[in-house]
Amino acid sequence: MLKKIERAQQLLKKEAAVFRCPTCHEPMHVEGVGLICQQRHQFDLSKKGTLYFLNHGVQTEYNKKMFTSRGKMIQSGMYAPVLNKIMHYLPQNKTVVDVGCGEGSFLAELSQAGLSGLKIGFDLSKEGIYLASNQLIDAFWCVADLTNLPFANEGLDTILNIFSPSHYQEFRRVLKDDGTVIKIIPEENYLKELRAAFYPNDEKKQSYSNQKVVQRFAEELAVEVDERITYCFDIPEERRLDLLEMSPLEWQVSQEVKAKLQQRPLEKITIDVRLLVGRKR
């Protein structure tokens, strides 16, 4: 059985043309245990088979504990109806990049549902990507910057953008002429029970609108699909504590509130999201 770094080397040899140097924007080729460009900027694979494309350190509040809980909730089926919808719009045997993939659970679930082709996940969080490298799927994982994607011009078929920021100028650059962006945006009732439990006295945190995000998407891309997906999910008993720690909502919650919820965790949660599919104009 091949080691992770050996599997990653094989993929790079086959797919090196997909990448470009994030420092000088020149093409790259495989040399040794990584990629190198004509200007000799070199990016070596880690033992886990991941690539670090940043030339600077990054501090994020997204940590291993949060990513682990998020992964368990995704694997529990919490987002299954959303992922089933996404599968309708994903091409087969093409190149798909998951932007802001975290621990890689969404890409893993889609792969298990039948997604084929070259799959790449990237995130700004090194911890998230190290966890993603443990996913039992054929995919490539890297740490990269959304504003300076390490991908060649017009080389990608689809960008997955699930609960993560967008950079449409870069998206248009790296997508093929017929390429698509599939974006999932939280709607007003998303995780409403959790927000109410975390912040019972803060109405601002219990209601919000992403209409500006939807408008921006429509300004940047030709919208082909705009669909709202809403349902209530029965949380498996063994996953109820993971729900409390799976998102940034938890960061500002008092210890007193957390303790109460750990004693009496939520049993149901509302999923309310917008599915957008846009194509380059």
Each model region followed by its residue ranges:
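N-terminal auxiliary segments of SAM/dcSAM-dependent transferases
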Residues: 1-59
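Conserved Class I S-adenosyl-L-methionine
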Residues: 15-16, 229-281
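Conserved SAM/SAH-binding beta-strand->alpha-helix loop
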Residues: 123-127, 147
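A short acidic, Gly/Pro-enriched loop at the edge of an enzyme's catalytic core
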Residues: 147-158
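Conserved beta-strand signature within the Rossmann-like core of class I S-adenosyl-L-methionine
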Residues: 179-189
